[in-house]
Swiss-Prot record:
Cofactor(s), by name: Zn(2+)
Coiled-coil positions: none
Enzyme Commission number: 6.1.1.10
Protein name: Methionine--tRNA ligase
Subcellular location: Cytoplasm
Organism: Borrelia garinii subsp. bavariensis (strain ATCC BAA-2496 / DSM 23469 / PBi) (Borreliella bavariensis)
Family under the similarity heading: Belongs to the class-I aminoacyl-tRNA synthetase family. MetG type 1 subfamily.
UniProt entry keywords in alphabetical sequence: Aminoacyl-tRNA synthetase, ATP-binding, Cytoplasm, Ligase, Metal-binding, Nucleotide-binding, Protein biosynthesis, RNA-binding, tRNA-binding, Zinc
Residue ranges annotated as motif 'KMSKS' region: 330-334
Pfam families: Anticodon_3 (PF19303), tRNA-synt_1g (PF09334), tRNA_bind (PF01588)
Binding-site residues for Zn(2+), renumbered to this chain: C143, C146, C155, C158
Summary of the function given for this chain in its UniProt record: Is required not only for elongation of protein synthesis but also for the initiation of all mRNA translation through initiator tRNA(fMet) aminoacylation.
Domain named tRNA-binding: residues: 560-665
GO cellular component: aminoacyl-tRNA synthetase multienzyme complex; cytosol
Length: 724
């Protein structure tokens, strides 16, 4: 029988601030670890930040810092948020610790020695300007499905999973130049060769019965579809070096090194780390993850351990939750939607209230939508009107009518006969990591305590039957003590406060549940929680709905910045649409060596000779459209005055030698990192409200300029008017 619980929460990636949904795993593991320790089981709770890989390298480029400095910054942010939530890690480390490289490389060398590593030649995008192979998320272009700007792994607009080669007009995210496909060698773990041993381990009844249904279904489906060799190396700089000749400029894929971080983080801080990680006979490895991490913990990490042929502690109990979502919206810092860890701290709502609500709605079997109104209702009814009310009414009654001293009580067997079986059920739910169910069973006991108090009407019987009333209140006091123990994994600060009410006269141990001695007096009492008010909840809902930011976002200059992409192009050739002679087909040079064309109704305004060879400005991210069967990939911009006079903006009026492909930006956006806007329709462009004023193009008084030369965009022929 296994005697030790090794508890892990999925290592959070350290390139962002965790939102409420991200906190589910660390909170879940925290509750289980606290329960385990209260039960007298030797327990170690491990977590830490996952710091290597593409996302970190990319974010460091965006923030103009080094990957390590970025990790240092976000590690501190994560740690401070978890501390506020009162998450009691035994170890909270980092995958950049001093032991991580050695352990990862040793795993690789063992796998290679045992014949589980293969070498393959593949094609990958390479940026000639930056002299690097581009990871999937380093490539941007148009999604082939919806034409929005997308990264090479997935389109955020339509959610389509992509390969970089699927993108239309792919570009390097760093320099915006077009990459080329280049051959490169990578190492793969031979999962098909490990499959039989992996399946034998999975089918072991002691393992599979301790997994959630979603984990079993997903893992079995993955195995049924057939395991494939999986790349374990990447052409990056930020990662663990590959100890193999010819691979000096490559690192291990983050999914390969990250789960090994559980081990290295332990070794970095625990001397007897092998008694935890090389002790599969006695150690019960309990892992808490989200459903997006299931296969890494049920297939990949176990395969690495099995393939090493060493006695590593391997996954036994897996708690894989579904998603916690937000008000039917997407968590997004930039959009101001959803509440993130640092936001929670500023709400004025105590951490135990947040913990309670997350556990109460823990997405164990289905996704859950966080709703502000539901938060208020659940907290006010279950946490306050039920649990907190029982504590307050019983202790207040004792102090008011019988004083601070608790007399030795007569055990009311009928009372406890209802309660004790429920304790056993709750402890079993904890053991099975069914935390939401455990909490709701505890609240049922609290509700029963309130009912017993109400039904016995002690305020009426205190004078006529003082001894019976004292015994009733004393039994309820011991029930409150037990509830504080059972609630300790969920709301630790509140449980400690109740313990202080009784002069710290007991320990948080499951062994004393149901005992009726040890409490001598009530030292003090106070209200545990204040009710959440509707006005406060309404304000918080508005604050984190994105609506408060909408007015600012709808300002024309912000719309332009985020939605409109203007570029300089040169007119190389002009044709007429054979079916509509008034339509000019302009063949353009946009600096990318790609054939681009737009269709515009210019008959009566210009001749071909007047425009050929000129540089104009187009809306480059307009959704493609067809005019009389001819595709148009943008729209030229022109100025129009109040008399309906119409003139195209000619860039030669602003600068002597225009450069095709140069972007038009707001003057106050100089030297800033600019986003690549998605495809838009004409209405979005119109809302930018570009005008010609005193011969210069402006938005809300801000000049439009050429990005590199900084020259202002001029409207020579129509000094005042609208731009259309």
């Amino acid at each position: 029988m296994k005697k030790m619980n090794l508890v892990t929460a999925a290592l959070p990636y350290v390139n962002n601030i965790p939102h409420l949904g991200n906190l589910v795993q660390v909170l879940s593991a925290d509750a289980f670890a606290r329960y385990s320790k209260m039960s007298g089981i030797e327990t170690l709770y491990i977590c830490g930040t996952d710091e290597y890989g593409t996302a970190t390298e990319t974010k460091a480029l965006i923030e103009k810092t080094s990957p390590l400095e970025l990790c240092n910054k976000y590690y501190k942010i994560h740690k401070s948020i978890y501390k506020w939530f009162n998450i009691e890690f035994d170890i909270f480390g980092r995958t950049t610790n001093k032991h991580h490289q050695d352990i990862v490389q040793n795993f690789f060398l063992k796998l290679e020695k045992n014949g589980y590593i293969k070498e393959r030649e593949t094609e990958q995008f390479f940026c000639n300007k930056d002299s690097i192979f581009l990871a999937d998320r380093y490539v941007i272009g148009e999604c082939p499905e919806c034409q929005s700007i997308a990264k090479g792994d997935q389109c955020e607009n339509c959610s389509k999973l992509l390969n970089p080669i699927d993108l239309i007009n792919p570009k390097c995210i760093i320099c915006k130049n077009k990459p080329v496909l280049k051959k490169t060698n990578h190492l793969y773990i031979d999962l098909p060769k490990i499959k039989r041993k992996l399946e034998k381990w999975i089918k072991n009844s002691t393992t599979s019965k301790n997994w959630n249904t979603n984990a079993l279904k997903m893992t079995n489906a993955f195995l049924r579809d057939g395991l494939k060799e999986r790349a374990i190396t990447r052409d990056l700089k930020w990662g663990i070096p590959v100890p193999k000749k010819g691979y000096e400029n490559k690192v291990f894929y983050v999914w390969f090194d990250a789960p090994i971080g559980y081990i290295s983080i332990t070794k970095n801080l625990v001397k007897n780390w092998e008694s935890w990680w090389k002790n599969n006979e006695q150690v019960n490895l309990v892992q808490f993850i989200g459903k997006d991490n299931i296969l890494f913990h049920t297939v990949i990490f176990p395969s690495i351990e099995i393939g090493s042929k060493e006695n590593w502690t391997i996954l036994n109990q897996l708690s894989s939750s579904e998603y916690l979502n937000y008000e039917n919206l997407k968590f997004s810092k930039s959009e101001g939607t959803g509440i993130f860890g640092n936001d929670v701290i500023t709400t004025g709502i105590p951490s135990d209230v947040w913990r309670f609500y997350i556990y109460y709605n823990r997405p164990e079997k289905s996704d859950f939508q966080f709703m502000w109104q539901d938060l208020m209702e659940r907290v006010n009814t279950e946490l306050i009107d039920n649990f907190s009310n029982l504590v307050n009414r019983v202790l207040t009654f004792q102090k008011k009518f019988f004083g601070d001293v608790i007399e030795t009580i007569e055990i009311q067997n009928k009372f406890w006969k209802q309660i004790i079986p429920k304790y056993n059920k709750i402890l079993n739910l904890f053991k099975k990591t069914e935390l939401k169910s455990a909490l709701k069973e505890i609240l049922k006991i609290s509700s029963l305590g309130n009912k017993i108090f109400q039904d016995n009407e002690p305020w009426k019987r205190k004078d006529s039957s003082p001894q019976e009333t004292k015994e009733l209140i004393s039994n309820l006091i011991y029930l409150i003590r037990d509830l504080s123990i059972l609630m300790m994994p969920f709301i630790p600060e509140t449980s400690k406060k109740i313990q202080q009410f009784f002069g710290n006269s007991y320990q948080f141990s499951t062994k004393i549940l149901g005992t009726k001695s040890g409490i001598k007096r009530i030292e003090f009492t106070e209200i545990l929680f204040n009710k959440l008010e509707q006005k406060k909840i309404n304000n918080l809902k508005l604050k984190y709905s994105g609506e408060k930011n909408m007015e600012e976002k709808e300002q024309p200059e912000n719309l332009f910045r985020e939605k409109v992409l203007l570029k300089v192009v040169k007119i190389n050739k002009i044709e007429r649409n054979p079916e509509a002679k008034n339509l000019f087909i302009l063949k353009l040079d946009d600096g990318t060596n790609e054939n681009k064309q737009i269709v515009s109704s210019l008959e009566g305004y210009y001749t071909e000779k007047e425009l050929l060879g000129k540089h104009i400005i187009i809306v480059d991210n307009l959704k493609p459209a067809k005019f009389r069967g001819i595709k148009s990939e943008g729209m030229l911009i022109a100025a129009e005055d109040k008399n309906k006079n119409f003139k195209i903006i000619i860039v030669e009026d602003s600068i002597k030698n225009p450069i095709p492909g140069e972007r038009i930006i707001l003057e106050n956006d100089q030297n800033k990192d600019l986003i690549c806007p998605p495809k838009i329709d004409i209405n979005k462009f119109s809302k930018a409200n570009i005008v010609a004023k005193d011969g210069e193009l402006k938005i809300n008084g801000i000049n439009l300029i050429l990005e590199h030369s900084k020259n202002k965009i001029l409207s020579k022929d129509i000094p005042n008017g609208i731009v259309c």
